[in-house]
A protein has these predicted regions:
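Cationic, amphipathic, low-complexity segments that mediate targeting or membrane/lipid association
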Residues: 2-20
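Short, positively charged and aromatic/hydrophobic N-terminal segments
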Residues: 4-5, 27-36
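Replication-associated primase and helicase/ATPase modules
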Residues: 19-22, 33
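Structured catalytic/translocation cores of nucleotide/phosphate-coupled proteins
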Residues: 22-23, 189
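Class I S-adenosyl-L-methionine
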Residues: 34-267
């Protein structure tokens, strides 16, 4: 015998309370990670800086994962090949990164990465799916940069294989990873640009000779060539996967980098 439906019966009241509590809990947790329910992204940022926004003119939308660099989250190292110069010139506090709440959100994301990677990965995958769906609705192409302020070997964590149709890209100071990319040993949907510092110029030249690209920070006007390789303007957009091979990606010094005395910035 079926019982008559009760709009405000005990079961209905219980489920309303349960779902209200669950939604409030989830919203609070995501807010602590820097999430806005209106953005519908947990970990990724879209349109958070001027440079990546320039890609829109080329038909691309960029989502970036910003973590707390180095060991600032009080966990493991996320920039294993950082030098003194790049540490001092780090753009971690540039733009919105200057705000305390933004830095705290990045710290919490990084702590989640180390403390509960399963949850972190689930949130990241949900973000990528939502971002791609949003791009499709807008008639834009999606690209994702996971190392906005970190240098993690994401190819070992199953991210790129899970989204074979999404273009991923990063900068890295790992010569091993950069050479792997130059030799075609990275996932086909992942583009990697090696970052020169004051302590890895020899490796940077090796990467260029192997067919890879290298980002170099210059103090003023970008030269036509560096170490015999053509220089392209890397400040015009952040779409590194559109660059030709065997080029130097010239970047003008910004923020603390303008006062560099380590050799990280090329005079």
């Amino acid at each position: 015998m079926m019982l008559p439906y009760q709009k405000n019966g005990p079961a209905q009241v219980f489920f309303r309370i349960f779902f209200d509590f669950f939604f409030a809990f989830f919203s609070c947790k995501c807010a602590r990670l820097g999430y806005s329910s209106r953005m519908k992204l947990n970990l990724l940022s879209v349109g958070a800086d001027a440079k990546t926004s320039k890609g829109e003119a080329f038909g691309w939308l960029t989502a970036i994962l910003y973590l707390a660099p180095a060991r600032q989250a009080g966990r493991g190292e996320v920039c294993t090949h950082r030098s003194v110069g790049c540490t001092l010139a780090c753009l971690y506090t540039a733009g919105r990164g200057k705000m305390s709440n933004v830095q705290q959100a990045r710290i919490r994301r990084t702590q989640l990465f180390f403390d509960d990677f399963a949850t972190f990965k689930a949130l990241l995958f949900a973000d990528i799916r939502a971002f791609v769906a949003s791009c499709e609705k807008q008639g834009m192409r999606a690209c994702v940069r996971l190392n906005g302020t970190s240098d993690i070997a994401w190819e070992r964590l199953g991210v790129f294989a899970a989204f074979p149709s999404v273009q991923f890209y990063d900068y890295s100071k790992s010569p091993i990873r950069a050479l792997q990319f130059a030799k075609g040993a990275m996932p086909s949907n992942y583009h990697l640009t090696f970052s020169r510092s004051e302590s890895n110029e020899a490796q940077a030249i090796d990467v260029l000779r192997a067919g890879g690209n290298v980002a170099v920070v210059f103090a003023s006007i970008l030269p036509a060539t560096w170490q015999g390789f053509p220089v392209v303007n890397g400040d015009e957009s952040d779409l590194r996967f559109l660059d030709s091979r065997n080029v130097v990606v010239g970047l003008k010094a910004k923020g603390a980098g303008k006062k560099d005395a380590t050799g990280f910035v090329v005079a």
